[in-house]
Swiss-Prot record:
Gene label: FAM193B
Cytoplasm recorded as keyword: yes
Chief site of localization: cytoplasm
Phosphoserine modification, residue list: 694, 706, 813
Location relative to the cell: Cytoplasm; Nucleus
Biased composition, class Basic and acidic residues, residue ranges: 52-64
Keywords in alphabetical order: Coiled coil, Cytoplasm, Nucleus, Phosphoprotein
Keyword Phosphoprotein: yes
Family: Belongs to the FAM193 family.
Protein known as: Protein FAM193B
Lineage: Eukaryota, Metazoa, Chordata, Craniata, Vertebrata
Record's compositionally biased regions (Polar residues): 516-526, 641-657
InterPro entries for the chain: FAM193 (IPR029717), FAM193_C (IPR031802)
Biased composition (Acidic residues): 382-393
Location of the region described as Disordered in the Swiss-Prot/TrEMBL record: 1-78, 158-191, 209-281, 381-409, 503-583, 599-775
């Protein structure tokens, strides 16, 4: 029958054969326990009901048995007290099982030893199935191999819900009961779904697999069919010689599961189990039950109720060891392969539990609770087990329980084995594979998605670089413009006169337009171009070069400037040009690049007046005008005039180039200068007067000075139109007229300025104009602040070139300026 059944049921048949081979052996030794078990559990009647339940209403059977007998027995007994399937009390069983299971099977080993071995090796105590349940399972399996799987699922569910869920689970101490109970427990929990259980065939396979797994193949026994046959032989053999087989703790343990297996397989793989049941099942089952009860009592189901004593000692080891033995966690073992002996027990419930167990916290807990029986332990059992097993089992079970909880949620226990082979391995595997594929796809797609972004990021730097370059270029242009403006401003008299001489920018500005209009409208326009050209002069050469370059240096504005410059250079000779230009030249020389610019600028406004040596008033006015022009034309540059004034400071350094220029200028200058001096003194005076009138008193005093002073005045004139401010400062600092004067800013210029500005505001104005003010903690206009920064810059720059400052500005001919102005 068994084989026939097993053939139809496939894995079940093999299992049965295996059981027949292996289990029958144990049946001989174990037969007594089954009767005792049956007697205890209501061997006759309970079995009958169990069988019916097994056959069709196993669910009902289990529930019926579970509610009444199983619950109390479970609670009362430390071992599985109820049949896994029918949940009948295992009182009789226990007596037999404890003695038979432990003694018969464990005769070789101490009763405790077997449970420990089982616990450690099998990792789960065997679940007990009453003979009635076994028979019913056999019948069920025979009648409905698949149906029984469902029935088992249901019966387990019912068991779980009925007895296992209640006391049965608590009483799941009895291995069978526990197995059933865990199943039913889960059912009771409502976590266990008949659907969640593997088909009877599959379950029996799993059960067998757990049995064989009990032999340790269970862990890896992925195929229930192979394992079942193997398991039963091993399992049953171990069952009847379970304690003898404890070495094969899985086997020894399996014997306990074997009963469970038979019961569940009876349910699932009725053929194998029935086969075992008739021959070995009854004996095996009882024997195992007896043996298992001890083991179970020790480790599995009493965890909460009866087994609390056993469980703590045995159950703990079982649970703890079993999980490892199972391969991972007890739940895993039970569920995973049912492979572990522990799993065998759970497999019936576990295989129903496979998913349930893995999903059902109860199942996990049960597994842990009774190791092998853990699955059978219902969640209640879990709780009980937690109590019975306490720290050991509970801790393990807690992990298992958490796993079980996850299992309930459709997740499976975390054990390695369960992950791959455990509860509903195929489904799980498929799910896991699908998830893995999804994740892989996500990662791949994510990486693909990220790649464009990364590429875009890579591309971004180019755009950013362009942006940065454009920004820097614009900033550079701004800086250039700023420098130009600063230079122009430095030379524009407006701010210089206002800052250094105290002249109102307006006054200076007014003269500037006036002089520009009268003397050189083009000059004023040139002045602005000069400002624009500031960079060009800066980039050009030294003032000398500037002089030479003036004609040769072509720059949009510089071309104009240079055209003026050549005239300017030519005009150097003219005294008027010399005087204003000397100042310009000095300053320009002081700051070679700046001086070029300044030359152009100042000459533009001032040169016209300089160009007219005969016209003193005109030069004066023009001189005045230059500063107004610069200031009016470039008030902001006026700010920078202070900066330029600084540059004037810097200009001393340039002055050496200026000196070079100066010599040539000097060559021209002496005669022109003197001639200009002759006219210039008056002119300077007049200019000074005019300048004073328009710009302030500053020009007057200085301008009234000697011809040299006039020359310097001319220079200063340039300065006071171009650097009114700087000039006074220089004058103050460098009152003694001398290009070598310490203030390299405008030593040459400084002389004339000193004379004039000294009288006016020389000391204070010069310092104010050329020396950067302390800007820390001082509130000042942004423009002023820029001017101060520029002054500081010029001062620092001037230091570098001061050595060049030794220029005889007196010899410098301002005619250059005049031509520039004429320009």
């Amino acid at each position: 029958m068994t084989r026939r059944r097993s053939r139809p049921s496939g894995g079940a048949g093999r299992r049965e054969r295996a059981r027949a081979t292996g289990p029958q052996k144990p049946q001989a030794p174990e037969p007594p326990p089954p009767p005792s078990l049956e007697a205890g559990a209501g061997a006759g009647p309970p079995e009958a009901p169990a069988e019916p339940y097994r056959d069709d209403p196993r669910e009902e059977d289990e529930p019926k048995l579970a509610p009444g007998p199983q619950v109390p027995p479970t609670t009362s007994q430390s071992v599985q007290t109820c049949c896994l399937l029918c949940h009948r009390e295992r009182k009789g069983w226990e007596e037999g099982p404890s003695q038979n299971g432990l003694v018969l099977q464990g005769e070789k080993l101490p009763p405790d030893f077997m449970p420990k071995l089982v616990k450690n090796l099998l990792g789960e105590m065997p679940l007990w199935v009453c003979q009635s349940c076994r028979k019913s399972m056999e019948e069920d399996e025979r009648q409905t191999g698949r149906e029984h799987a469902v029935a088992i699922s249901l019966s387990h569910t019912s068991c779980k819900s009925q007895s296992c869920g209640g006391d049965s689970h608590s009483s799941s101490s009895s291995s069978s009961s526990s197995s059933s109970s865990s199943s039913s427990c889960h059912g009771n929990s409502g976590d266990w779904d008949p659907s969640s259980f593997l088909s009877a065939h599959k379950l029996s396979g799993l059960w067998n697999s757990p049995h064989s797994s009990g032999a340790m193949p269970g862990g890896s026994l992925g195929s229930p069919p192979t394992i079942p046959g193997e398991v039963f032989p091993i399992s049953e053999h171990h069952r009847h010689s379970d304690l003898t087989a404890p070495p094969n703790s899985p086997t020894g343990h399996h014997p306990q599961p074997a009963p469970l297996i038979p019961s569940h397989p009876g349910s699932f793989g009725s053929p194998p189990h029935p086969h075992l049941l008739p021959t070995t099942p009854a004996v095996h089952f009882p024997a195992q039950v007896s043996e298992c009860p001890v083991a179970v009592a020790a480790a599995p189901h009493t965890p909460g109720p009866c087994q609390s004593p056993h469980l703590p000692s045995t159950s703990m080891p079982l649970l703890k060891m079993p999980p490892p033995f199972s391969g991972c966690s007890h739940p895993c073992s039970g569920h995973c392969s049912g492979h572990c002996s522990g799993p065998l027990l759970p497999p019936p419930s576990s295989q129903q539990l496979p998913s349930t167990h893995s999903r059902d916290p109860g199942c996990k807990g049960h597994k842990f609770t009774h190791s092998g029986l853990t699955c059978q332990l219902p969640q209640p059992c879990e709780a009980d087990e937690g109590l019975g097993e306490e720290e050991d089992s509970s801790s393990e079970r807690s992990s298992c329980t958490s796993s079980s909880t996850h299992q309930r949620d459709g997740k499976f226990c975390d054990c390695c084995y369960c992950e791959f082979f455990g509860h509903n391995a195929e489904k799980e595997k498929a799910q896991l594979a699908a998830e893995a594929l999804k994740q892989a796809n996500r990662s791949v797609s994510g990486s693909r998605e990220l790649r464009p972004a990364r590429e875009s990021l890579l591309g971004w730097p180019d755009r950013e670089l362009d942006r940065v370059n454009s920004f820097l270029n614009s900033r550079l242009q701004e800086i250039k413009n700023t420098v130009k403006d600063s230079i122009c401003a430095s030379f524009s008299m407006c701010e210089l006169s206002v800052d250094s001489n105290g002249f109102s920018k307006e006054g200076a500005t007014e003269p500037k337009p006036q002089s520009l209009a009268p003397s050189n409208p083009s000059g004023s326009s040139e002045q602005r171009p000069d400002i624009n050209l500031d960079l060009s002069p800066l980039t050009l050469g030294s003032p000398q070069n500037h002089m030479l370059q003036a004609p040769g240096e072509p720059a949009p504005p510089w071309a104009e400037m240079r055209s003026p410059h050549p005239p300017w250079t030519e005009v150097k000779g003219p005294p008027p040009g010399i005087i204003p230009e000397n100042g310009l030249v000095r300053r320009l020389n002081t700051v070679p690049n700046l001086s070029r610019m300044i030359w152009v600028k100042t000459p533009k406004p001032g040169n016209p007046s300089s160009e007219e040596p005969s016209i003193k008033g005109a030069p004066g006015c023009k001189q005045e005008l230059p500063e107004p022009v610069a200031s009016g034309g470039k008030p902001r540059k006026g700010k920078r005039q202070g900066n330029q004034a600084k540059k004037s400071e810097v200009s001393p350094a340039s002055q050496s180039p200026a000196c070079l220029e100066t010599p040539s200028a000097k060559g021209q200058t002496p005669s022109p200068k003197q001639p200009s001096k002759a006219p210039e003194p008056p002119r300077v005076d007049s200019c000074a007067e005019a300048g004073e009138g328009s710009q302030g008193t500053r020009p007057g005093p200085g301008w009234a000075d000697s011809p040299k002073a006039d020359k310097e005045k001319g220079n200063s004139w340039r300065n006071w139109p171009g650097e009114a401010k700087a000039r006074p400062l220089e004058q103050e600092s460098v009152q003694p007229p001398g290009p070598a004067r310490p203030q390299s800013f405008q030593q040459g210029k400084g002389r004339s300025r000193r004379s004039r500005n000294k009288q006016e505001k020389s000391a204070s104005s010069l310092d104010d104009v050329f020396l950067p003010k302390d800007m820390d903690g001082v509130e000042m206009d942004e423009t002023d602040r820029e001017v101060e920064y520029f002054k500081r810059f010029c001062l620092d720059s001037a230091k570098q070139t001061r050595q060049k400052v030794a220029v005889n500005w007196t010899n410098f001919s301002l005619k250059k300026t005049t031509p520039s102005t004429a320009q």
